[in-house]
């Protein structure tokens, strides 16, 4: 009865008027369905082969030299991100391929690498659908390589540790007894700074850091230094500035701005460094007048 009201038979979607008239169902509909199914099957069967040229080097192999190795991946059977392709290659094509990865959602920074000429996160970088182009993947530039796509971040983390990235209070009598509260306005000053995930994409895209990586702290670390300098709960702003007075730690920045262009979180390390330089000028004036 319900089918009659709607005017459509529940059997194969045939209009009810044909059934009431005693007419046979139109077989053309079945033919159309068959054609559609065939087209879908043919489309699925057509492979979309994408080539990935990946940096390889294994220090545990005597005489092994850095080289590029090409892998082919069917994009119809792969997720949309470069990290999906790397995982597929490791799981199905070459288990020796080595890279870092963890969260797969742009939060941890583990999968930072150089993809198609730019530093970014493999988990948030979409695969270029142009099958005629080979996607080239390298470890982060100008860093020692542990193996394949794994850079040695020891110096980077040592520099981060050197800025003492935590709250420092001159009066610690209330430590552990109550919260150090902030106003909404003071808290908002930290926006665009605290979101840094320390992936090192910005620092390793900076020519100044390539040239003076042992002395220049680099954009990532300097942005974090600024984050603690302007935190209203911190009492060591002047001491933090004094730590950066030498010619290299801060002043090797020449506002090339590669750092801001490449940041996968959309942050602006170059602006943070400029703000530190402004604070440094005021600090030096105070020190000279004292």
From Swiss-Prot:
The keyword Lyase does not apply. [2Fe-2S] cluster binds at residues 103, 108, 111, 123. Its EC number is 1.3.5.1, 1.1.5.-. [4Fe-4S] cluster binds at residues 196, 199, 202, 263. Coiled coil: none annotated. Pathway: Carbohydrate metabolism; tricarboxylic acid cycle; fumarate from succinate (eukaryal route): step 1/1. Its cofactor is [2Fe-2S] cluster; [3Fe-4S] cluster; [4Fe-4S] cluster. A ubiquinone binds at residue 211. One of its GO terms (molecular function) is electron transfer activity. Residues 50-143 form the 2Fe-2S ferredoxin-type domain. Keywords: 2Fe-2S, 3Fe-4S, 4Fe-4S, Electron transport, Iron, Iron-sulfur, Membrane, Metal-binding, Mitochondrion, Mitochondrion inner membrane, Oxidoreductase, Transit peptide, Transport, Tricarboxylic acid cycle. It comes from the Eukaryota. Iron-sulfur protein (IP) subunit of the succinate dehydrogenase complex (mitochondrial respiratory chain complex II), responsible for transferring electrons from succinate to ubiquinone (coenzyme Q). SDH also oxidizes malate to the non-canonical enol form of oxaloacetate, enol-oxaloacetate. Enol-oxaloacetate, which is a potent inhibitor of the succinate dehydrogenase activity, is further isomerized into keto-oxaloacetate. GO terms for cellular component: mitochondrial inner membrane; mitochondrial membrane; respiratory chain complex II (succinate dehydrogenase). It is found in: Mitochondrion inner membrane. Gene3D superfamilies: 3.10.20.30, Alpha-helical ferredoxin. The lineage of its organism: Eukaryota, Metazoa, Chordata, Craniata, Vertebrata. The keyword Plastid does not apply. Residues 1-38 form a transit peptide. It is a peripheral membrane protein. Residues 186-216 form the 4Fe-4S ferredoxin-type domain. Pfam families: Fer2_3, Fer4_17. This is Succinate dehydrogenase [ubiquinone] iron-sulfur subunit, mitochondrial. Binds 1 [2Fe-2S] cluster. Binds 1 [3Fe-4S] cluster.
């Amino acid at each position: 009865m319900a089918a009659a009201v709607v005017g459509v038979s529940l059997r194969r979607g045939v209009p009810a008027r044909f059934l009431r008239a005693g007419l046979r169902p139109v077989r053309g509909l079945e033919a159309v369905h068959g054609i559609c199914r065939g087209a879908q099957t043919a489309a699925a069967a057509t492979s979309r082969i994408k080539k990935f040229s990946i940096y390889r080097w294994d220090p545990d192999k005597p005489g092994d030299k850095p080289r590029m190795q090409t892998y082919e991946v069917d994009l119809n059977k792969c997720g949309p991100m470069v990290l999906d392709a790397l995982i597929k290659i490791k799981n199905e094509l070459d288990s020796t391929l080595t890279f870092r990865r963890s969260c797969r959602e742009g939060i941890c920074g583990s999968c930072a690498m150089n993809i198609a000429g730019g530093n970014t996160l493999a988990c948030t970088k979409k695969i270029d659908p142009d099958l005629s182009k080979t996607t080239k993947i390298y470890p982060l530039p100008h860093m020692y390589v542990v193996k394949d796509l794994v850079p040695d971040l020891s110096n980077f983390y040592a520099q981060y540790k050197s800025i003492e990235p935590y709250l420092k209070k001159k009066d610690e009598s209330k430590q552990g007894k109550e919260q150090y509260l902030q106003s909404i306005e003071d808290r908002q000053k930290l926006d665009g700074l605290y979101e840094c995930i320390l992936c090192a994409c910005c620092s390793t895209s900076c020519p100044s850091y390539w040239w003076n990586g042992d002395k220049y702290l680099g954009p990532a670390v300097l942005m974090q230094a600024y984050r603690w300098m302007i935190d209203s709960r911190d009492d060591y702003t002047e001491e933090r500035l004094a730590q950066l007075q030498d010619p290299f730690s801060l002043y090797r920045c020449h506002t090339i701005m590669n750092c801001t262009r490449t940041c996968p979180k959309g942050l602006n390390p170059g602006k943070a460094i400029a703000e530190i330089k402004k604070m440094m000028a005021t600090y030096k004036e105070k020190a000279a007048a004292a």
